Amino acid sequence: SEIPEGFKEARGFHFSPLPLYPLAELINTLPEDAWIQVDPHYEWFFPEYREEWERILRRVSVVLPSEDEFTKFFDIPLAFDIDNYKKHMRELSAMGPPIVVLKMGPQGAILYLKDEDVFYSIPSCAEHVVDVTGAGDSFCGSLLYNYVSGDDIITAAIKGMVGSSITLENTSADENFHVAEGVAMERFRRVEASVREKIKIL
């Protein structure tokens, strides 16, 4: 549960799914003002762990559950009931994170900004789906990188969708690690306007 001191100077930290207790230990080693993004582990994001999550989420800037994880955590039906989802996204944000991103698979994502008390529906920009493995991870990583690099959160989320769309077209992790430089930015420029037109305030 140790993070090298040099790493602690990073502009942001993303925690992919980890068991609950190592996750808490790692987060507690980071500076108080660190920008921390957490993608919950599906085996640990359940109501019985709520107290532990409340302690963890006090330190978290962005939490990004999948729809399945989110509905299990709040013990609500997996059915797109936007009013019910909004209620529980606010509840999740009240535990600490000013930003909640609900990953919705082919439907894209719902983004909640606590400071504005506003929900945005961010559509997917997938063009050709070969393998869904890693698409959510690419979304999370792209969103974090672009946000801490200076983009506003909506632009960062669109770039997250672009990263996800590229991963969806590949058949292996090796392909994902060898995407040519500039491919993502070229796609972003091509799809940005059409994606922004489809973004809705919920």
Model-based region annotation:
Residues 3, 52-53, 129:
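Acidic, amphipathic alpha-helical patches
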Residues 1-21:
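Conserved phosphate-binding/catalytic loop of the ribokinase/pfkB sugar-kinase fold
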